[in-house]
Curated annotation (Swiss-Prot):
InterPro entries: Ribosomal_protein_uL29 (IPR050063), Ribosomal_uL29 (IPR001854), Ribosomal_uL29_CS (IPR018254), Ribosomal_uL29_sf (IPR036049)
One Pfam family of this chain: Ribosomal_L29
PANTHER family associated with the record: 60S RIBOSOMAL PROTEIN L35/50S RIBOSOMAL PROTEIN L29 (PTHR10916), LARGE RIBOSOMAL SUBUNIT PROTEIN UL29C (PTHR10916:SF0)
MF terms (GO), sorted A to Z: structural constituent of ribosome
Homology family: Belongs to the universal ribosomal protein uL29 family.
UniProt KW Transcription keyword: no
Cross-referenced NCBIfam families: L29 (TIGR00012)
Organism encoding this protein: Methanocella arvoryzae (strain DSM 22066 / NBRC 105507 / MRE50)
Name of the protein described by the UniProt record: Large ribosomal subunit protein uL29
PROSITE patterns per record: RIBOSOMAL_L29 (PS00579)
GO biological process: translation
Keywords recorded for this protein, A-Z: Ribonucleoprotein, Ribosomal protein
A GO CC annotation given for this chain: cytosolic large ribosomal subunit
Amino acid sequence: MAILRAKEIRGMSDKELDKQLKDLRNDLLKQHAISATGGAPENPGRIRELRRTIARILTIKQEKKQKEMKR
């Protein structure tokens, strides 16, 4: 899964964001499990990338929610 940029995330619907968030969280869980069992991850930067992408999605969802509340 590629890195999602803020522009791409803003173009997604709420359902797409929820699905993407669920997929990323599952992937992060798998990566943590691999490192916790002592295995070497294929890409050590992947965990950081996943955490940042999840944070981007949550931030943009919150921005959209606040915009709707102001209307």
